[in-house]
Amino acid sequence: MKCWTLGDRVLAVSMGDLTKVRAEAVVNPANSLMIMGGGAAGALKRAGGSVIEEEAMRKAPVPVGEAVITSGGSLPARFVIHAPTMEEPGMRIPLVNAFKASYAALRLASEAGIESVAMPAMGAGVGGLSVAEVAREAAMAASILRGKWPRYIILVARGEEAYRGMEKGVREALGVEGGECPADLARLV
């Protein structure tokens, strides 16, 4: 795990399973209809139960650039923040959607008083973007929201290649190498 400190906030890149992270909230790179079929959304639904999708669908449609929050069902995370990267399931997306979704998720987490949030590669996978690109967009969103996002943002990579891509994207966005992480962060991943 590598960390970048922005004021009193920490942005981390970690390898793991988003459905097992013990952050207060996890982010679902949703579609505007809130259908949780494939990718990270499908994994969150399978692990946390259909109640997550049912709650989210009651709030649909949600445009790209906005986010909604639901319970975490039976996930270790208390909440799921649904931030659409696409209008309909299975769409290829432009890079700006990864930024808009990341920004919306972090802004909502801050407004809800959430202290720790875990995010997958928003827009990679089903959306068709590279992990490095979407990690750069997430880091840029955090940088713009400086001081107005949760204490911990954890970008969760599935596998070594995705981890390297996330690390590269964050490094490009922030212009510095990541370093050691606070000891209390390890309990979340």
UniProtKB/Swiss-Prot annotation:
Domain Macro, chain residue ranges per copy: 1-174
PROSITE patterns tied to this protein: MACRO
Superkingdom: Archaea
Record-annotated disulphide pairs: none
Database matches in InterPro entries: Macro_dom, Macro_dom-like
UniProt-listed SUPFAM superfamilies: Macro domain-like
Name under which the protein is recorded: Uncharacterized protein APE_1648.1
Organism of this sequence: Aeropyrum pernix (strain ATCC 700893 / DSM 11879 / JCM 9820 / NBRC 100138 / K1)
